[in-house]
Amino acid sequence: MNSFASLGLIYSVVNLLTRVEAQIVFYQNSSTSLPVPTLVSTSIADFHESSSTGEVQYSSSYSYVQPSIDSFTSSSFLTSFEAPTETSSSYAVSSSLITSDTFSSYSDIFDEETSSLISTSAASSEKASSTLSSTAQPHRTSHSSSSFELPVTAPSSSSLPSSTSLTFTSVNPSQSWTSFNSEKSSALSSTIDFTSSEISGSTSPKSLESFDTTGTITSSYSPSPSSKNSNQTSLLSPLEPLSSSSGDLILSSTIQATTNDQTSKTIPTLVDATSSLPPTLRSSSMAPTSGSDSISHNFTSPPSKTSGNYDVLTSNSIDPSLFTTTSEYSSTQLSSLNRASKSETVNFTASIASTPFGTDSATSLIDPISSVGSTASSFVGISTANFSTQGNSNYVPESTASGSSQYQDWSSSSLPLSQTTWVVINTTNTQGSVTSTTSPAYVSTATKTVDGVITEYVTWCPLTQTKSQAIGVSSSISSVPQASSFSGSSILSSNSSTLAASNNVPESTASGSSQYQDWSSSSLPLSQTTWVVINTTNTQGSVTSTTSPAYVSTATKTVDGVITEYVTWCPLTQTKSQAIGISSSTISATQTSKPSSILTLGISTLQLSDATFKGTETINTHLMTESTSITEPTYFSGTSDSFYLCTSEVNLASSLSSYPNFSSSEGSTATITNSTVTFGSTSKYPSTSVSNPTEASQHVSSSVNSLTDFTSNSTETIAVISNIHKTSSNKDYSLTTTQLKTSGMQTLVLSTVTTTVNGAATEYTTWCPASSIAYTTSISYKTLVLTTEVCSHSECTPTVITSVTATSSTIPLLSTSSSTVLSSTVSEGAKNPAASEVTINTQVSATSEATSTSTQVSATSATATASESSTTSQVSTASETISTLGTQNFTTTGSLLFPALSTEMINTTVVSRKTLIISTEVCSHSKCVPTVITEVVTSKGTPSNGHSSQTLQTEAVEVTLSSHQTVTMSTEVCSNSICTPTVITSVQMRSTPFPYLTSSTSSSSLASTKKSSLEASSEMSTFSVSTQSLPLAFTSSEKRSTTSVSQWSNTVLTNTIMSSSSNVISTNEKPSSTTSPYNFSSGYSLPSSSTPSQYSLSTATTTINGIKTVYTTWCPLAEKSTVAASSQSSRSVDRFVSSSKPSSSLSQTSIQYTLSTATTTISGLKTVYTTWCPLTSKSTLGATTQTSSTAKVRITSASSATSTSISLSTSTESESSSGYLSKGVCSGTECTQDVPTQSSSPASTLAYSPSVSTSSSSSFSTTTASTLTSTHTSVPLLPSSSSISASSPSSTSLLSTSLPSPAFTSSTLPTATAVSSSTFIASSLPLSSKSSLSLSPVSSSILMSQFSSSSSSSSSLASLPSLSISPTVDTVSVLQPTTSIATLTCTDSQCQQEVSTICNGSNCDDVTSTATTPPSTVTDTMTCTGSECQKTTSSSCDGYSCKVSETYKSSATISACSGEGCQASATSELNSQYVTMTSVITPSAITTTSVEVHSTESTISITTVKPVTYTSSDTNGELITITSSSQTVIPSVTTIITRTKVAITSAPKPTTTTYVEQRLSSSGIATSFVAAASSTWITTPIVSTYAGSASKFLCSKFFMIMVMVINFI
């Protein structure tokens, strides 16, 4: 049993140790550095010791200005505005790349014993640092000529972290390869096809041969992104020098030679692999947007190799021979360009390395040293000459560009929306089923009088015609740049030869072709149209005649054999729905450059001196002229949809989307060349040493007459294998911008209305859109007295109907009345998944040995001087590896979501007295009996509201609406083929008082969610040891967040629509009242302009005594109006400076009506009524107001003014939330407001400025500090702004976070939630060898709750970002979090602060506490000794702080191995302490107040009839006068809202927070807060992780187990 117990105990101990170790490892944070991968492989025996150190600096700066003028016209419903926008954008981008590398390797030479070891081991050391800084500052200015002005977008800048990886590779000659991957924004490729034929100058018949050389040279020039202009596209700007483009010039040539005699002979083939970039490239272009006239740059060209056959002059006494020389020319050009004087000064510093090769001859002498390891082979020395030249040239860039564009304007005319309506067409098929369709139609009314009988027709024509049209654009761009060449330059060594070169004079022509979709319009045949004269009579009685074409149709109706013909017409003013799209536009351009380089080296002597080798070489040459012609085709294809407009409209919702779409693709060429070169030569040269010039030789020709006899025995083998592989995939660039998408969603709910008429209950089921947030119960009593005279057989019997109707309706309405979504999605990207891949494989292997014997013979003295020189040189493998991988990702996602706007009427007092007098004259058989109906409705209600921040007290001001309308309806009732016309004339008088101020707009619930995605791409550069190439991978990740600027405002919710004939009379019944409460927080005045109406058709069927009468009526559709109000109020403020703040708003309203049918049966008579319910309009609010608290308000207003002023800010002395109202004394137009003395500061105040700006800037540099600044401000929504600035020098770091104090003031908003989350990921490798930067997301959660009882509960918990920086192991920066919890509860009389706790780290200070239970904290302390941790103490703390001061020490033994045995070599003491703290906070119960809303509605309609007279001529030439009328029915609804307060008590759950903390030790700090919250209130967990390291013990588990077993025993 003891053994089993021992095993169980051992298992427990092992399990505990495993858990403890896991816990220790959990807190360990190891900082790993990313090593630069290094690959060194030497497998050749003749690899000499070599070291290469290169420093590469690259900097480029470019800027472009993009002006554009955009003009758009938007027409929807009754809103039409034109806003030509002129935008000018300028960007200045500068980048710098500095790379330095050091590499050294060593291996033995020809040691067979150690060759195996050399090929496997190599010592290398490297040091690489890379810094890339990019700064972009666009400046945008916009101007609009409309009534509103778009906000100016603030400058934004983006940061681009970069990481560079350097890889060094050295392989054997048979597997040497070089790869180069690059990605550029543009590519320019050229192909040179040339054919040359050369004949050697030898006179030997056997060696006399000629060969033709054909080759293809392909050059690819990839410059930086050039300037882009919207009006003119420049393929390649000729005004900029080549070096200022900061591009890579890749030149590859392939020469294939074929001899004429078809003999097997190796022809020299040269592959110029200059695509490996120049060793040193310093390019800087200073061309700011302001326009500088001076540009200085220096440019070092890559080594260029030229080959030529030089024929030696032959003589009878000298055996001629042919030799070939390959020269390598490298130059450094330092030029400065002064644009002001248009002159350029160029300084050349060039060096020529000439490598002659000798042909095979008799081997006379062999250097014994060169025989080692090879068989009779030696390598000829390389002679290098340096020369410099200076030249001045007039750089006269004359560029002329002419562009012509032709556009065909198009215009579309549509019907006035007031003349259209939605018509429900019921179609009955043969089976008897009814199908209803809804379509827009044009309504017209015609009245026909025949023999004194007036017949009125109401017809409509469906709007079904469409017109599609497209725009044709043709443009041509031509540019002719001119540049003068250099005046001339000479080699500063000998005047016997000249070297002249002329600049390139490119001639580029661009031609563009575009394809567009034509549009055509279909119209009616002229045979179906006629000219109709429309006579319009206004209210004054004047007649206006207009002539318009109309579409005439004839309808024939046969009833019992009687044929009736109807003639109707529709004016030809149908609307057109159109979709405009440009299908494609293809632009192909060909740029032809004709460079001419003439190298004149006459027959004279070219003497080159080299100071390094102290040798002078004289070469006799003949004339050689090189001329090349380059044709550079550039193709560009793009597909662009300039403007795509799609408009669709449904009965309940409408959507409008417009977006420009542009996509383009570019392509480049791919070149793959494989070549092998083997050639030899014979020449005379001085003996030189490349590495260490210890021997000086001089060879001078005394005179021209002297002939040189030389005998050279040289054997040389050179193998050049070059593989150039370039892959450049098509570059896709798509720019899709969905600027505005408006979709309206209507929520309808069913309601049941019970009507009791004379004791008979009738139930109606109707539907109306949701327009409130509560249950509405309306009870109304209406008494209607109707006097109707029914005539039958010339006898009329009057009938009096008295109807008492009691209506009770309960409508459950949803919380969202309408939804307006303004989404702005900008997707801009340039993707090149495969980037550009260039692989260059170059292998050079050369072995040579030569023995030369030279004899100088002079013709005058006949003396000969002989000298011998022999040189053996071996060139090892030179391999290059260039690999550059660039990935470019443009990802921009921006979305703006605006939820719906809830509006309700609060705290209003409505007193209305309405008297309606309807006089109806019923005529039958030429007898008219007048009927007078008088209805007096008086309603008075005083609702109450608990909110006081935006309390609206309405003054007793009445606005009387007086209208006089006359309705004339003519109905023809047909029965048994006998039709009796009936004319009904209705004269209506209405005088309606209207409250001046009836509504107060609440705060809008607008939440903004803006997501930004910043993707940082890395770059890798790999280049070899022996070549100082420029590894350039400039990856630009552009982050552009397009800000959609919209203006929105709330609609004036006044339920009054007036026609043009109405009169507005504003009277003030109480001008001398001193107790009339008045608040200027929000005021609306009646619109005084005439508004056209849109009508909806309805049909009513009435059956009286078996006679069915069909009435066709229509009700107006409330138009969508645009109100741009700008109010400027000057206020005299005490203790404040007088300020004048303008306020502007833009509102759009769309109200539609839907038809409903009600059937009523009274005394067996069935009556069908067709009614309509208005669809609640969509409205958005956006106001810009900056006000301050006022103690004295002076208001000057007129009844006809349209002003909107919304105050959303309060000062420190704001009104108390206890319900106090400010009372003002008004006298005339001056009001003095009395502010109560009691005031309290609200818990939170929301104050924001009306601007939307997003800006971020960053810069990374090794020498200066790194700054990352981001500012995000989104207004007028809930404040979500954060400013983060991180400074990261090489050794220290600092992070400061400033969050604006959340402030909120609301009076009607139940709940508003705003969450702002910003994530910044910055990566820059390598920053430093001992530093790592980590930024955590910054999240800020703000929730504002506003209850109806003036009880405000605000909680703002912002988690500060944690920063982990470990520049060294011993230094750790810790930033403690701060938590602030504030709860404010207000009662009807006072406000008191219950709990206010401020916590800093783990210490909390209690400011004021009335909680029922104080927080109890239980602290558990865990002690770790060695690898065992156990719980030692447990303490309970009351209050808000617990202190643990115990410190525990633990020792660890670290073992080190030396030799075969191991012994303890070091003992260290580590301190570790972990504290587990649990805090429980039980808050007190919160009592809030709920509001029950009751509303009562009263509806009275106003009918307006406008007479219209049509005059037309029939086929007989007789004039026919037809009188029609348009009827307007305007419902006036008065709603009284009553509120009732109900107390609601809620008890939050206790909040438990548990966190574990490691106390400070020598190894660092690791703290983790874990918050477990379960409550109904707001709890924000705070998670902070700090960089540190925990001690990891090098003890064996087995050792610990044995110790435990021994102890147990």
UniProtKB/Swiss-Prot annotation:
It is found in: Secreted, Cell wall; Membrane. Glycans are attached at residues 29, 231, 298, 347, 386, 426, 495, 535, 661, 674, 713, 889, 907, 1079, 1400. Residues 137-148, 196-212, 286-312, 1231-1243 have a biased composition (Polar residues). InterPro entries: Flocculin_t3_rpt. It is a lipid-anchor; GPI-anchor. Keywords: Cell adhesion, Cell shape, Cell wall, Cell wall biogenesis/degradation, Conjugation, Glycoprotein, GPI-anchor, Lipoprotein, Membrane, Pheromone response, Secreted, Signal. Required for efficient mating. Plays a role in maintenance of cell wall integrity during mating. Important for mating cell projection shape and conjugation bridge diameter. Plays a role in cell fusion and nuclear migration. The keyword Ribosomal protein does not apply. This is Factor-induced gene 2 protein. Residues 1589-1609 form a propeptide. Residues 129-165, 196-243, 266-312, 846-876, 1231-1259 are annotated as: Disordered. Residues 1-22 form the signal peptide. Induction: By mating pheromones. By cells of the opposite mating type.
